[in-house]
Amino acid sequence: IAVLERLKPGKDFPPFTAEDLNGKPVSYESLKDKLLYIDVWATWCKPCIKEIPSMKALQEAYKGKPVTFVSISVDQDKEAWKAAVQREKLSGIQLYTNLSMNRDFIDNYDLSGIPRFMLVKNGKIISISAPRPSDAKVKELINANL
């Protein structure tokens, strides 16, 4: 219950650190002054993969607008993640965290399943369970926060 209380709209978004494609750590601090649409996914997750075309279309629709797309892979196999990013030509900020080494990530976001989409603005939670890219409601939510 304490976790759910912490993740309500308007609360501070819990910080994270994850790796980029070059293995360089990227901290949430460097992104927190923006509107972020965050996607937590993995290469082995079929519903996650199914969202890729819709995610690409969503990113295209918001090109040049003040929204930053951040995808965080929770794959066990870092190379599988890197290969998928290349193969699918994924854009936006692509990050990786190994859940077995990063239990905090699961606990901080009450991550019981993926894909998980979150919308965060200026460090505050808008939605910890935002609509998927394939859901038309996602544009309403993003537009209301631009």
Residue ranges with predicted function:
Residues K50-E88, S100-D107:
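Structural microenvironment flanking redox-active thiols in thiol-disulfide oxidoreductases
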Residues L90, T97-N143:
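Thiol/disulfide oxidoreductase modules built on the thioredoxin-like
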Residues D39, F69-S73, L95:
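Short beta-strand segments
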Residues I1-K24, E29-L31, E60, E79, ...:
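N-proximal helix/coil linker or "cap" segments that precede and/or mark the start of modular domains
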Residues K32-A57:
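Conserved redox-active cysteine motifs that mediate thiol-disulfide chemistry
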Residues K32-K34, G64, L90, L111:
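Active-site acidic short loop of glycosyltransferases
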